[in-house]
């Protein structure tokens, strides 16, 4: 009985151990199904078997260095994002010297071209400035000559108009503004002279007839001798000098005839009128 029990316990323990081992292996194997196999040779370097990022053309990274191997250093994988260092070879140095020489030549050429352009621009500016000055001077000369000619013509015309029997001075400037020609100015001059002649010859036509009669009677009395005696010449001259005052009186009478008679009042030899009638 005891042996049978011992045998059962042994079987149970073995089955438990085997069950535990199988369960542990079942948990470990699914997680490592997709794992890649890594084969390590004797020298401790990785072999190029996978298509992962661990590919190298030369030596691989010594993940597991071998103590027996003579090389103990670790090769660092270079960064692909960084540019490789420039090696100062002979060919590279020659190319660099040529590039520097070419850059210096281009710089010198650019400077010469810039200087040439500046000189050309300065010449062009000077030429334009000189042309503008000559044009402005010629225009000023033309204006001066035209102004002088116009002034000469105006002075001549004004002198012609000033010379006349009427004694009136006519300004040619106003006639030129209103567009009057020489023919029109001559007509105006003839009209003014004829008008002045009519005024000089018949001043009594504009005054009242009683003044005309009085003037004629006065002239007859002056020419006839008084009482058979001759009148002194000085007296006749003095009486002739009084005629302009008579003409002034006639003109005054003509002016007063247009005033309202109710507004004026005569006191002896004076006429008094209201200011309201004149306004």
From Swiss-Prot:
The keyword Phosphoprotein does not apply. Keywords: Nucleus, Ubl conjugation. Ubiquitinated by COP1 in darkness; this leads to proteasomal degradation. Induction: Induced by far-red (FR) and blue (B) lights, as well as transiently following transition from darkness to red light (R) in a phyB-independent manner; responses to red and far-red lights depend on phyA, and responses to blue light rely on both phyA and cryptochromes. In the dark, binds to COP1 and undergo degradation through the 26S proteasome pathway. The keyword Ubl conjugation applies. Interacts with light-activated phyB. Binds directly to PIF1 and COP1. InterPro entries: PCH1. It comes from Arabidopsis thaliana. It is found in: Nucleus. Disruption phenotype: Reduced seed germination in red (R) light; this phenotype is reversed in plants lacking PIF1. Reduced PIF1 degradation in response to red light pulse. Hypersensitivity to gravity stimulus and increased greening. Increased hypocotyl growth independently of far-red (FR) pulse at light-off, as the result of a rapid loss of active phyB due to increased dark reversion. Highly unstable phyB-containing photobodies in plants lacking both PCH1 and PCHL. This is Protein PHOTOPERIODIC CONTROL OF HYPOCOTYL 1-LIKE. The gene is PCHL. Together with PCH1, regulates growth and development adaptation to the ambient environment by controlling negatively phytochrome B (phyB) dark reversion, a temperature-dependent thermal relaxation process during which phyB reverts from the active to the inactive state. Contributes to red (R) light-triggered photomorphogenesis. Promotes various light responses such as seed germination, hypocotyl gravitropism and chlorophyll biosynthesis, via direct interaction with PIF1 and COP1. Prevents DNA-binding ability of PIF1 to negatively regulate the expressions of its target genes. GO terms for biological process: red or far-red light signaling pathway; regulation of photomorphogenesis; regulation of red or far-red light signaling pathway; response to blue light; response to far red light; response to red light. Mainly expressed in cotyledons, hypocotyls, leaves. One of its GO terms (cellular component) is nucleus. Transmembrane segments: none annotated. Its main location: nucleus.
């Amino acid at each position: 009985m005891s042996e049978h029990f011992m045998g059962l316990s042994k079987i149970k323990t073995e089955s438990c151990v085997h069950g535990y081992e199988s369960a542990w292996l079942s948990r470990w194997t699914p997680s490592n199904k997709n794992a890649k196999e890594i084969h390590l040779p004797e020298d401790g370097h990785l072999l190029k078997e996978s298509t992962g990022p661990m590919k190298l053309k030369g030596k691989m990274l010594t993940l597991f260095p071998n103590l027996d191997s003579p090389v103990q250093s670790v090769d660092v994988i270079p960064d692909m994002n960084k540019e490789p260092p420039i090696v100062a070879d002979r060919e590279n140095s020659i190319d660099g010297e040529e590039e520097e020489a070419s850059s210096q030549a281009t710089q010198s050429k650019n400077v010469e071209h810039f200087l040439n352009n500046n000189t050309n621009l300065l010449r062009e500016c000077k030429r334009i400035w000189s042309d503008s000055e000559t044009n402005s001077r010629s225009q000023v000369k033309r204006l001066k000559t035209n102004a002088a000619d116009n002034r000469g013509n105006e002075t001549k015309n004004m002198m012609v108009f000033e010379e006349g029997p009427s004694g009136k001075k006519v300004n040619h400037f106003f006639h030129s503004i209103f567009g009057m020609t020489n023919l029109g100015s001559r007509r105006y001059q003839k009209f003014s002279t004829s008008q002045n002649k009519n005024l000089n010859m018949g001043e009594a036509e504009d005054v009242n007839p009683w003044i005309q009669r009085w003037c004629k009677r006065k002239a007859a009395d002056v020419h006839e001798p008084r009482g058979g005696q001759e009148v002194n010449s000085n007296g006749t001259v003095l009486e002739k000098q009084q005629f302009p005052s008579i003409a002034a009186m006639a003109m005054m009478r003509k002016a007063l005839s247009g005033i309202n008679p109710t507004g004026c009042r005569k006191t002896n030899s004076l006429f008094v009128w209201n200011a309201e009638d004149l306004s």
